[in-house]
Structure formats: structure tokens, C-alpha cells
């Protein structure tokens, strides 16, 4: 296909020359060049044309007239979203395994793209330093803390274990109590890997909660396997994944109460927290007073991986861990989200691509909102059936529970006959 000239005219009457292949849908060209559909009007041979249906033709005169005043071309070149003559040629670095990019705003409002390349050794040091700095700056671990460490055996919780082991001398003295909810959607192989890794860390107090513990916690009539399969088949992946995570957290909270320890640590990384905040903003609720450290009823949730992305965790494990610890199998049917969940991760990843480091702005904005506007903490209750701590932050208008003495999931399970209306008194 021949290349064809497309002219982009900005609000300062500057003309930017782009090229598109004949036969290409213009909507595809716009997406490939990071030109938002609603930022331009399309003129073909001086006539307004629908940019979503037009196909680029060789002899047509195509002009994209920006209706927005921001400097799209300048921004795209700064971020290297456009790789044309206005962008410095990228020099190959065969030693580099990773480039960290952050969009940095100066006091005059102009932004710069800061980026650093890492080889294997410098990358491991960078992740170790980010991990320690993230814990110390937010006081996630204090001297003589006891922390319940929830482990699935997946890549995120394994990376957390390796980071704790490698940097233990740089952190305040603390005691870890490991727990894995086994025989549910977690595979036997994952549980084995979790046990190996926690032994390497030197954690003496580690418990694998069996299926009987799960069924006892939830008061299932027909058992976990039947319940989760029924929910998956009848209500889909969105319901089954949230139910599974609720079951695991209910078991972890029960275990923590039995231990008398109320600091809970999960393997939530940068995107998990960024996505959670993004989703709560779209729903009109707030995640908590802080992304890496938040109050949840009688518990405190600690997320030591908050500064590190999933990609960085994966690379880190590939370097520092044996192969059978760095590999991750496909998620089970019960651990796959639906579109309502996945689109939030997708949008968060896209936003990080066009605004590198945006997630950190979200984290700080959440803390400022709570501090400056003195937002009241949501009301928390404890489910009469499973014992999980839950919030009323969604509001009464979205509360569809038929049975108000239990959490949303247990109310639903009572309705379909998978748990009794009232748990037995021991």
C-alpha cells in the first residue's frame, strides 16, 4: 500500500505532516497516532467527513482540524508516541533490560519525560531500593510489628517474599506470620511454591488453611467446590472472582483474629492499587485514607508493593528466583474477571502509557482528599455468617442485600440455598 499524506492542523494554525497507508480506516490511523476522536474534525477534499467510517484513499486531500487547544503534537513527541523527524533517534542499548519512564512537570508547567535504562544488576538494585523506600516513607512496617502475610503462591506474593528476604536488614525489625488459603482456587503447585519461598525467608509461623477451614468459615451446605462452580455457571466470572476473593479474605481475617494480629499484608502492586482508586472514583466512593496503608474496620491493610509494577515484579523474579518460582500458570476459571473488572486495568495501563507515573499522582491525591476535606471514615460491619469486614461505602441505593445481617455475598448465598439463614451456635 502507498503512503498518503495526512495534515493535522492545530489551534495555533501550525501544520503537522503525518502519513497513512491507502486503504487504512481513519479510525485506525487516529488510534495509532494517539489522536483522540473528539479532538478533531476531519475534512476530506474540503468536506466534513465521519472519521469513524472514512477509508484513506490515495488521491484524497485529508485535513484533521483540531477543535481542542492543547498541544497534541508536542506532547506526542515528548512522550515518543510519535517517532518522526521531530523526535530524537533512539540509540540501541543491548545491555538494557528495562526502561523506567516518568513524566515530570516543572514549576513553569512544562513537562519533561525522564527515563532511565537498567541492566540486570542495576534493575535489581533499583527494585530493592524502591521497595524499601516505599515501606519507610509511608511507615508501612514499624519496629516490632506483627504482620499477617497472606500468600497465594502466585507471582505477586512470591515477589513480596523475595523482596522481604533480600532487604530484611534495611527494614524495621518485625515478625511475619504467613497464611495460605489452600484447596480452593489456588493450585496445589502454587501452594507448594509458597511453602518453599516462605521457608527460604525464615518465617517460622506459617499455616496452610485446608478446605475444611474454608467450609467451616463460610458455613457452606454443599462445600466450596459446588458453590464456586454454581456461581460461575449461573452468574459468570465477575461474580465468581469476587466471591472467591471474599472467601479468601474472610478466612484470612478469621485466622488473624485467632492470632490476635490485626496488620494484614497483601501482594497488591502498583497497578492493583491504581486500578482500585480509578474504579472507586468512577463509582463515587473512596478506597480508604491511603492506597498502601488503610484502615479496614479493626484491621490495617498494608501493601508493601505499592511502588512496583507487575512488569517490574515479573522481571525481578525472573532474575532473582529459580525458574519454578518465577513462572506463573494461567489463572483458573474462578480467578478470571469479567469486562466490568478488566476494563479498569486496561484503562489504567493506557493512562500510564500516555502519562508515565500517573498512578503516583492518584495515590497522593487520595491522601490529600482525606486530609484536606476531613472525609469521614465509612461505617464497617462484620458479617454474621463468614465474619468478613465489609463497608457501606457504596450507599443504601446500591445495597441489594435481602438479608441485612450478613455481607452482600452471604446474602446472595442464603438466597440460593448454599448457606443456612442463620449459622449454628457452637
Q: What is each residue range found by the language model?
A:
Residues 108, 116, 380-383, 404-407:
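Residues immediately within or flanking Cys/His clusters that coordinate Zn2+
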Residues 12-14, 30-32, 36, 48-50, ...:
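ATP-dependent adenylation/nucleotidyltransferase module used to activate substrates
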Residues 13-15, 19, 39, 50-97, ...:
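A broadly conserved sequence feature marking short terminus-proximal activation segments
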Residues 121, 385-388, 409:
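Short, cysteine/histidine-rich loop/knuckle motifs that typically chelate Zn2+
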Residues 272-353, 415-416, 423-426:
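Catalytic subdomain that performs nucleotidyl-dependent activation
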Residues 1-18:
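Eukaryote-biased recognition of intrinsically disordered, low-complexity regulatory segments
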Residues 394-404:
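Short linker/helix segments within small regulatory modules
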Residues 391-392, 412-415:
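Short functional micro-motifs and their immediate structural scaffolds
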Amino acid at each position: 500500500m502507498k503512503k498518503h499524506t495526512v495534515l493535522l492542523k492545530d489551534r495555533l494554525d501550525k501544520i503537522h505532516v503525518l502519513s497513512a497507508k491507502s486503504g487504512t480506516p481513519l479510525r485506525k490511523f487516529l488510534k495509532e497516532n494517539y489522536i483522540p476522536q473528539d479532538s478533531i474534525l476531519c475534512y476530506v477534499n474540503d468536506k466534513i467527513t465521519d472519521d469513524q467510517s472514512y477509508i484513506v484513499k490515495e488521491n484524497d486531500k485529508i485535513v484533521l482540524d483540531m477543535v481542542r487547544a492543547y498541544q497534541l503534537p508536542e506532547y506526542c513527541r515528548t512522550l515518543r508516541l510519535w517517532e518522526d523527524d521531530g523526535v530524537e533517534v533512539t540509540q540501541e542499548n543491548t545491555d538494557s533490560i528495562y526502561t523506567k519512564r516518568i513524566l515530570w512537570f516543572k514549576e513553569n508547567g512544562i513537562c519533561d519525560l525522564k527515563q532511565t535504562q537498567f541492566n540486570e544488576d542495576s534493575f535489581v538494585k533499583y527494585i530493592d531500593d524502591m521497595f524499601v523506600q516505599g515501606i519507610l516513607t509511608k511507615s508501612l512496617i514499624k519496629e516490632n510489628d506483627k504482620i499477617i502475610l497472606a500468600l497465594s503462591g502466585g507471582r505477586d506474593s512470591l515477589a513480596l517474599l523475595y523482596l522481604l528476604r533480600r532487604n530484611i536488614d534495611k527494614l524495621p525489625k518485625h515478625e511475619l506470620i504467613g497464611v495460605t488459603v489452600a484447596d480452593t482456587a489456588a493450585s496445589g503447585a502454587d501452594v507448594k511454591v509458597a511453602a518453599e519461598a516462605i521457608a527460604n525467608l525464615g518465617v517460622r509461623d506459617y499455616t496452610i488453611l485446608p478446605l475444611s477451614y474454608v467450609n467451616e468459615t463460610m458455613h457452606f451446605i454443599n462445600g466450596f467446590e459446588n458453590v464456586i462452580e454454581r456461581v460461575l455457571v449461573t452468574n459468570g466470572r465477575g461474580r465468581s472472582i469476587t466471591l472467591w476473593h471474599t472467601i479468601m479474605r474472610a478466612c484470612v481475617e478469621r485466622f488473624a483474629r485467632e492470632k490476635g494480629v490485626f496488620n494484614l499484608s497483601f501482594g497488591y502492586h502498583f497497578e492493583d492499587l491504581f486500578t482500585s482508586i480509578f474504579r472507586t472514583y468512577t463509582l463515587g466512593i473512596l478506597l480508604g485514607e491511603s492506597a498502601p496503608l488503610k484502615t479496614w474496620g479493626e484491621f490495617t491493610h498494608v501493601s508493601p508493593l505499592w511502588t512496583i509494577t507487575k512488569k517490574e515484579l515479573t522481571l525481578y523474579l525472573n532474575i532473582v528466583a529459580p525458574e519454578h518460582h518465577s513462572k506463573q500458570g494461567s489463572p483458573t476459571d474462578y480467578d478470571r474477571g469479567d469486562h466490568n473488572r478488566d476494563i479498569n486495568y486496561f484503562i489504567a495501563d493506557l493512562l500510564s502509557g500516555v502519562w508515565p507515573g500517573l498512578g503516583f499522582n492518584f495515590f497522593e491525591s487520595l491522601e490529600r482528599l482525606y486530609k484536606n476535606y476531613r472525609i469521614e471514615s465509612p461505617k464497617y460491619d462484620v458479617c454474621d455468617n463468614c465474619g468478613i469486614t465489609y463497608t457501606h461505602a457504596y450507599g443504601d441505593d446500591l445495597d441489594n442485600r435481602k438479608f441485612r445481617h450478613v455481607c452482600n455475598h452471604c446474602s446472595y448465598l442464603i438466597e440460593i440455598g448454599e448457606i443456612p439463614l442463620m449459622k449454628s451456635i457452637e
